[in-house]
């Protein structure tokens, strides 16, 4: 008879990204984690983007408004903080680390049936890299691997493409080296960010769109982001859509074979390389004109719409 392993026993460590001055967020999150062994919770001092070398200097900040400078500093600090968590997990030789942003809001304690299902998924998947317990889907198809009925409705764990939002996810040790090699350090963060834009954009468009990697996610989200003042957007923001007890994000479930074929389909590959080319072009734009904070994106306006917005912004400068 197999031994039942609880979720919080299966996770080797929990890294919580928290800016030193945001003690309010740290205290609120700790209230949600009282059932987690205290020795597993590790506060990771977040990088304050405004304190990075070359902030508001060099070509990337040419002509930037204060709002734009703060926005990109927030993004840089965020991605370096996530990189620090991965490095921390590797240094401690953890096999599985749960990484949390300090605005995470759990909709289940993960101490019962849902948590047990998550453990079974991780045990049964012979090779996986990331498991998102909360995210914004970036691709409309997913392949279910396990489902469970709960008082709040059905919860499905599925193989997904890299999503957006990174407030609650598990990283397996098999991903540490690739992530650390690809993510920037303080020395090259401004250059890296010009092309890759942000941490979750890199996951959605690059790291999580490779056939050899297995990215997992949950429908609906087991963890969302609470209403707090955002140190990136610089206003109150909340990402609570698709949470447990609500309608899940729209998704079409397909079988494993169909999902695997997607990575090799001409349409998928064309869109992937078009997106990478668009990001490369945007990187050159930032090098020539400095960072900008556009009101539209490729995702919301399409390639032509985003190009027109960029040209309009360029004319104003």
Regions flagged by a language model, labelled:
Residues 1-100, 104-317:
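An acidic/histidine-cluster motif and surrounding catalytic segment
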């Amino acid at each position: 008879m197999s031994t039942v392993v609880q979720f919080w026993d299966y996770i080797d460590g929990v890294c919580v990204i928290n800016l030193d001055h945001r003690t309010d967020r740290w205290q609120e999150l700790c209230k949600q984690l009282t059932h987690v062994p205290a020795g597993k919770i590790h506060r990771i001092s977040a990088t304050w983007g405004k304190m990075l070398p070359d902030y508001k200097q060099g070509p990337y900040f040419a002509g930037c408004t204060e709002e734009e400078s703060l926005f990109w500093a927030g993004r840089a600090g965020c991605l370096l903080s996530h990189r620090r968590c991965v490095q921390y997990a590797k240094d401690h030789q953890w096999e599985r680390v749960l990484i949390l942003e300090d605005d995470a809001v759990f909709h289940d304690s993960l101490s019962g049936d849902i948590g047990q299902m998550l453990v079974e998924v991780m045990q049964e998947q012979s090779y996986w890299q990331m498991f998102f317990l909360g995210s914004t889907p970036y691709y409309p198809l997913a392949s279910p691997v396990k489902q469970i009925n709960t008082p709040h409705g059905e919860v499905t764990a599925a193989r997904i493409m890299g999503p957006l939002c990174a407030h609650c996810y598990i990283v397996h040790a098999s991903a540490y080296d690739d992530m650390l090699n690809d993510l920037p350090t303080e020395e090259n963060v401004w250059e890296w960010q010009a092309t890759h834009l942000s941490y979750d954009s890199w996951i959605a468009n690059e790291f999580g769109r490779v056939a050899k990697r297995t990215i997992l996610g949950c429908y609906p989200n087991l963890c969302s982001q609470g209403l707090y003042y955002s140190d990136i957007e610089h206003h109150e923001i909340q990402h609570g859509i698709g949470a447990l007890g609500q309608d899940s994000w729209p998704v079409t479930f397909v079988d494993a074979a169909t999902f695997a074929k997607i990575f090799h389909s001409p349409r998928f590959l064309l869109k992937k390389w078009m997106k990478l080319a668009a990001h490369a072009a945007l990187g050159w734009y930032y090098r020539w004109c400095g960072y900008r904070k556009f009101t539209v994106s490729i995702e919301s306006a399409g390639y032509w719409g985003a190009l027109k917005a960029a040209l309009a912004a360029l004319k104003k400068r």
